[in-house]
C-alpha cells in the first residue's frame, strides 16, 4: 500500500479535516476505514447553506450557524443546529437539506472535546487552502508544462514559497489533547467467533 511504503501508519486513529468533496471522503474511508475520523469544514458548510437562502435571510441564518458552531459542548451545538434545521425546513427546504447533509461530521471536533482555539483551527480547511492558494499563484505564471515531473517540481516550489509564510496554528500547544483523544479511541475490532463442540 502506498501509504505504508511512505511511512504512514494506517492502523492509528487519525482526524481528517476535509471539505465536502465526496471522492476525497470515499478514498479516506476506503483506505483507513473506522480509523478515520472525518471533520467536515464548517466554513464550507456555512457557505453552502447560505447560498440557498435569500439575501434578506442570510444575516440571521449566518448568525445562528456561527453561534451553534461556537458552542463548546457537542450536545448543545447539535441541538442548536437541529433547531436551525427545523426553522430552515419552513424557510427554505433546500437550505435545510444542505445543512443536514454531513452535519454530524461538521461536529467531530466538538465530539472530541477539543479546546476552543484548537477546535476553531481544526473545524475548517482554511490552513491548507491558504497554502494551496500560494501554489496556485506560483503555477499560474507557468506557460508551458513539460510533463508530470515538471508539474511536481512547480507544486513543490510553490509549497516552499508558501512555507515561508506559515505561522503556527492557533491552539498548537493543545495538540497533545487531540493526540490523547485519538489514542483513547479504538475502532471496533474484529469479532472472534469461537465454536464449541455439541455434547
State where each predicted segment sits.
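Conserved beta-strand -> loop -> alpha-helix junction used to position metal-binding or nucleic-acid-contacting
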Residues: 15-22, 27-66
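Generic hydrophobic-segment detector
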Residues: 9-10, 62, 92
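Acidic/histidine-rich catalytic cores and adjacent linkers
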Residues: 22, 70-199
